[in-house]
From Swiss-Prot:
It holds the Pfam family TPP_enzyme_M_2. InterPro entries: MenaQ_synth_MenD (IPR004433), MenD_middle (IPR032264), THDP-binding (IPR029061), Thiamin_PyroP_enz_TPP-bd_dom (IPR012001), TPP_enzyme_TPP-bd (IPR011766). Catalyzes the thiamine diphosphate-dependent decarboxylation of 2-oxoglutarate and the subsequent addition of the resulting succinic semialdehyde-thiamine pyrophosphate anion to isochorismate to yield 2-succinyl-5-enolpyruvyl-6-hydroxy-3-cyclohexene-1-carboxylate (SEPHCHC). It catalyses: isochorismate + 2-oxoglutarate + H(+) = 5-enolpyruvoyl-6-hydroxy-2-succinyl-cyclohex-3-ene-1-carboxylate + CO2. The keyword Metal-binding applies. The keyword Secreted does not apply. This is 2-succinyl-5-enolpyruvyl-6-hydroxy-3-cyclohexene-1-carboxylate synthase. It is an enzyme of class 2 (transferase).
C-alpha cells in the first residue's frame, strides 16, 4: 500500500466524519500538500454529499466560508495547503469566533521531520490559531498504527464542541510525500477501514449525543418585575429569534431599543438619533430593569445608555460567553430570545416613557427632511429597503454605512440582514456577502465602503460564481469617512486616517468582467436595480459621495436632536 493511497484513506475518514456533522459546503484553495483532502472532497461532491467551492486567495476563501456558515447555520469546511496559506485564514477565524459562526478549518502541513530544518513552505502550524478555535486537533502523520476508530472519535469530539459553543474547529493534517497517483479502488477496500466499514455505509455520527433538555424557566420574581418600568434592548439575534418581541414590548408598555442586526421592527425607530437628547436619555436611565437580548450593538448611543445604566440588568442569549462589556451585576439567562419571551408572559400596561415616543415620531419627519430627495450615502441608508426586492437578503459592511442604516432606517419588513460585527473589520466583506448568497441560494444586496472594497478587491472574482442576482453597492466617499467623527486635526486626519485615494471602481469591475453602473439619481438607480435583479449574476453599483457629506449630516442630526424640546 503506497503512502499516497493511505493519505487518501486518512483524508476519506476525516471528510466522512465532517459530513456526518452536517458539513455540506467545502471551500478549497489550490495547493499541493492538501491534495489528499482536496481529491477526497471532490469524490464526496461527485456523490452529491457536498458542494466544493474554490478561490485563489485564502483570506477571501475563509470569509467566503464564513458567509456560507452564516446563511446556512451549518458548519462549513475549509481546505488549504501549508505555510502562509493557512495563516491567511486568521482574519476569518477571528471573525467566526467573535460572532459565533461554525467553520472547520483543515490545514495541510509538512510532517514533523520537515519542520524547523529549512524545508520549503514549512511553518509551525500546530495551535497556530491560539485560543480562537473552540477545538484544535493536531493530527499525526497518517499511519496504520493509528486506528480509524481513533481518528473518527477524535474528530467527532472536536466537531461536537461546536454544538456546545459555536466557533471554529482547527484540524492540522500533516502529509508525507508522495501525494499523487493513489489507487482509488485500494482506498475504498483498504483493510485499515475494515473496523469502520459499517459506519461508512451509514449516515450517522460516531457518537450520538443526547441534546440537553434546558427548559427556560420564568424568573422567580417575574410577577413583580413585569409591573415595573423596563427597557428591552435587542442586539444581534439569529434569524427568527426576535419573533414576537415587538408585540411583547408594546403589551408591556416597555421601551424597545433595536439594533439593525436584530431582525426586529422597532417600536421607537431612530434610537441612535433620539438618544442624543439628554432629557429623554436621563428619563430612560430611570428604568427599573433593562433586559438585553443578544449583543454587538452598532449604535454608540445605545452602548452609552447600557454603560450608564445602574439598575437591575438581565442578559438573555443562548451563548455561554460574556456579552456585557460594561460588567453589570446581572442575572443571566442561557436561552434563545423567543423562548425567553414565551416563558415570561407580558402584563398589559400603558407606555411609561411618552417622551421617547414623541421624540421618535419627531425624528421620522425631521430625518426625512434633512436627508432630502437626492441619491447619496445618507439617503441610501435611510431608504435601504428600496435597494433590494422582498426575496433578497441584505449584507451590510462595516464602518460608516452600517451606522447610518442603524441610525436612519425605520425597518418595516422582515428581511434577513447579515453583518461581520464580531470583530468589525473591513476585510473580507465582499467574500462574506458572496458566501451568504451562495449558502442561502437567494438574491443579495451588499453594501460596502470604498476602503472595504479596495481591501477585498480579490474577492470581486468570487462574484462570477453567484447563481442568483447579486448587487454590490460600493459607497465611494474617497477614503475612510468614518474617521471624520474623530476629534483629530483636519490635516492629520486626512493624511493618516481618511487616506483619500481618488480611485473609481469602473475599471475594477471591468478587470473581473462584471456589470457596472454609476447612477446619479434615484430614478437612475431604480432602472439599474430593475435590470440587475432580473439577471442571475452580479452587478457592481458605485455611489459617489462627498467625503464629508454623510458625517456632517449625521453630526448635525445628533446635535439638533440633543437640544430638541419635546412635550409628551
Amino acid at each position: 500500500m503506497s503512502i499516497s493511497t493511505f493519505n487518501r484513506c486518512w483524508s476519506k475518514v476525516i471528510l466522512e466524519t465532517l459530513v456526518r456533522h452536517n458539513v455540506k459546503h467545502v471551500c478549497i484553495a489550490p495547493g499541493s500538500r492538501s491534495t489528499p483532502l482536496t481529491l477526497e472532497a471532490v469524490r464526496l461532491q461527485e456523490r452529491g454529499e457536498v458542494r466544493c467551492h474554490t478561490h485563489f486567495d485564502e483570506r477571501g476563501l475563509g470569509f467566503l466560508a464564513l458567509g456560507m456558515a452564516k446563511s446556512t447555520n451549518s458548519p462549513v469546511a475549509v481546505i488549504v495547503t501549508s505555510g502562509t496559506a493557512a495563516a491567511n485564514l486568521y482574519p476569518a477565524i477571528i471573525e467566526a469566533r467573535q460572532s459565533g459562526e461554525k467553520l472547520i478549518v483543515l490545514t495541510a502541513d509538512r510532517p514533523a521531520e520537515l519542520l524547523e530544518c529549512g524545508a520549503n513552505q514549512a511553518i509551525l502550524q500546530e495551535n497556530m490559531f491560539a485560543s480562537y478555535p473552540v477545538a484544535t486537533v493536531n493530527l499525526p502523520k497518517p499511519g496504520q498504527n493509528y486506528a480509524a476508530k481513533w481518528l473518527i472519535s477524535t474528530l467527532d469530539q472536536a466537531c461536537h464542541s461546536q454544538l456546545v459553543e459555536k466557533g471554529v474547529v482547527h484540524i492540522n493534517v500533516p502529509f508525507a510525500e508522495p501525494l499523487y497517483e493513489a489507487n482509488v479502488t485500494e482506498i475504498d477496500e483498504h483493510v485499515w477501514l475494515g473496523p469502520v466499514r459499517r459506519w461508512l455505509g451509514q449516515h450517522k455520527k460516531w457518537t450520538e449525543y443526547q441534546e440537553p433538555q434546558l427548559e427556560v424557566l420564568m424568573h422567580e420574581h417575574w410577577d413583580d418585575w413585569r409591573t415595573k418600568r423596563g427597557v428591552i434592548v435587542a442586539g444581534k439575534l439569529p434569524q427568527g429569534h426576535g419573533m414576537g418581541l415587538k408585540l411583547w414590548a408594546e403589551t408591556m408598555g416597555w421601551v424597545l431599543l433595536t439594533d439593525v442586526q436584530s431582525g426586529v421592527e422597532p417600536t421607537l425607530p431612530y434610537a441612535d438619533i433620539w438618544l442624543a437628547n439628554k432629557t429623554v436619555r436621563e428619563k430612560l436611565l430611570q428604568a427599573d430593569l433593562v433586559v438585553q437580548l443578544g449583543a454587538h450593538f452598532v449604535s454608540k448611543r445605545i452602548n452609552q445608555f447600557l454603560s450608564d445604566f445602574k439598575g437591575e440588568f438581565w442578559v438573555v442569549d443562548e451563548s455561554p460567553k460574556r456579552l456585557d462589556p460594561y460588567h453589570h451585576i446581572q442575572t443571566r439567562f442561557n436561552a434563545k430570545a423567543h423562548l425567553w419571551l414565551r416563558a415570561h408572559p407580558p402584563l398589559r400596561q400603558k407606555p411609561w416613557l411618552l417622551e421617547a415616543m414623541a421624540l421618535s415620531n419627531f425624528c421620522s419627519s425631521f430625518i426625512e427632511q434633512q436627508v432630502g430627495g437626492s441619491l447619496n450615502e445618507a439617503s441610501l441608508a435611510h431608504h435601504i429597503e428600496r435597494a433590494f426586492p422582498k426575496n433578497a437578503a441584505l449584507f451590510l459592511g462595516n464602518s460608516l454605512f452600517v451606522r447610518l442604516v442603524d441610525a436612519l432606517t425605520k425597518r418595516t419588513e422582515n428581511y434577513p440582514i447579515y453583518t461581520n460585527r464580531g470583530a468589525s473589520g473591513i476585510d473580507g466583506l465582499i467574500a462574506t456577502a458572496v458566501g451568504v448568497g451562495i449558502g442561502a441560494n437567494q438574491a443579495v444586496a451588499a453594501v460596502v465602503g470604498d476602503m472595504s472594497a479596495l481591501y477585498d478587491l480579490n474577492s470581486l472574482a468570487l462574484l462570477k460564481k453567484v447563481t442568483q442576482p447579486f448587487v454590490l453597492f460600493v459607497i465611494n466617499n474617497n477614503g475612510g469617512a468614518i474617521f471624520d467623527m474623530l476629534p483629530v486635526e483636519a490635516e492629520a486626519k486626512n493624511a493618516y486616517y481618511r487616506l483619500p485615494h481618488n480611485l473609481g471602481f469602473a475599471e475594477a469591475a471591468s478587470v473581473f468582467d462584471l456589470k457596472y453602473a454609476r447612477p446619479y439619481t434615484w430614478a437612475d438607480l431604480g432602472s439599474v436595480l430593475k435590470q440587475a435583479y432580473m439577471r442571475k449574476e452580479a452587478t457592481v453599483i458605485e455611489i459617489k459621495a462627498g467625503p464629508n457629506d454623510a458625517t456632517n449630516l449625521y453630526k448635525r442630526l445628533l446635535e439638533q436632536i440633543s437640544f430638541a424640546v419635546i412635550g409628551a
